[in-house]
Amino acid sequence: MEWSDEGIILGVRRHGEAGAIVELLTRSHGRHLGLVRGGASSRMRPLLQPGNSVLAVWRARLDEHLGYYQLEGTRMRAATMLASSHAVYGVTHLASLARLLPERDPHEDIYEMLERTLDDFDDVGDAATHLIRFELAMLAELGFGLDLSACAATGATVELIYVSPKSGSAVSRAAGEPWRDKLLRLPAFLRDDNDGRNGWSDQDLRDGFDLTGRFLLRNVLEPRGQGHSDARDGFINAVTRHLARTAIP
């Protein structure tokens, strides 16, 4: 058995004296593990870091075997990310989200979104909006997508500023006003369907993480006996600290 594919490194663990088991999210073969001979060496260390993109060749005698990887770096992001606390926490959290996907099950849209998210991690605010969008995409991929296209009560498609915590559907300003204290806020950058580069405030980011966090916890994590990762909390705290330092008085 042999295939080649693009991949993003999610995690690495030592195997034996010199080897390493590498976990990739690949474009066409999903989340997939393989053994890299000599992967524990200092020569391989810069390549085998979470967040780096690689061209992978996987070989095994049988499809169900762990198999072996040969990896070639195509985008080495890790060195830059290690200099920023939000990026370190962010890539760890993104990897934990990707691990919610079944192994060896292709999710090309998620792969492409992960790649775009990692490529735009230099700016803290952009990184936060992209990560919120990624969490929304993961909810949809796992069968728990939110309906933010129209008001659940009236069908209106404008002034959608709330989300029902029960149904996960948008609610308009007029319909939601009597119950505003019981509804979640829908951030402007999600309402406007922009690319996350503008139209957000600090409050929008807090609302966004509250929104995705609520549904991830209830629908995905708690049924698996899990909670939010420490990396998610670390990312949010790093973003909050950065925005507080750079706020205009």
Swiss-Prot record:
DNA damage is among the record's keywords: yes
Gene responsible for this protein: recO
GO biological process entries: DNA recombination; double-strand break repair
Record carries keyword DNA damage: yes
Keywords: DNA damage, DNA recombination, DNA repair
Higher taxonomy: Bacteria, Pseudomonadati, Pseudomonadota, Alphaproteobacteria, Hyphomicrobiales
Cross-referenced HAMAP family: RecO
Name of the protein in question: DNA repair protein RecO
Function: Involved in DNA repair and RecF pathway recombination.
